[in-house]
Amino acid sequence: MIPAPGAGSEGTKKKRKRRRPANRAPQTSTSGMTPTPSKKPARPYAKRVDEVSAGGLVIDKSGLQGLLIGRRDQKDPEGKKLLWSLPKGHIEEGETPEQAAIREVAEETGINSQITQSLGVIDFWFMAGGKRIHKTVHHFIFKETGGLLAAQESEVDEVGWFPLAEIVGLLAYPDEKKLIAKNAELLA
């Protein structure tokens, strides 16, 4: 005998039990009960700090060499390795990025210069002292106008002139490497 439609199990759906994610505890009724606090204390967000700096690449009077600053690598156990970078520093209140760049180059290297053109802007994030730092650095190309090469003792370990063709290979920071490589035609 053939069952009539709807008379048997055909056409009826079985109710599925809803699965909960493995990392979730079963829900229980808490009516009349106070919820128990989490065992882990909430982790506070790191404070965000915005910093704006300016600097760049100074080209010597011959047009063949660029100026870099070297700082000791804090991760080097022997303390001998230098991290080479472009001279730069914070923009002070009332300064334009151009004014700050010229001042910072002179302070860190002893070299006076004038800006010939913009090189670009680097924007990045890092953690320091428990704070999230958002840093924007305005970079320029400079022409040397005078001064005597001398490292600023409080911030820089060494300064030096290097052939322009070697600058990208010497730079320690990938963002600066990319910026110079992208603008290589401006250095010729």
Locate predicted features.
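N-terminal strand-loop-strand
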Residues: 12-15, 21-86
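A generic structural micro-feature
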Residues: 48-50, 83, 116, 131-136, ...
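Short, charged/polar surface micro-motifs in flexible loops or helix N-caps
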Residues: 62-65, 74-75, 92, 121, ...
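Active-site segment of metal-dependent pyrophosphate-handling enzymes
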Residues: 110-147
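NUDIX/MutT-family hydrolases
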Residues: 139, 143, 148-181
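C-terminal alpha-helix
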Residues: 182-187
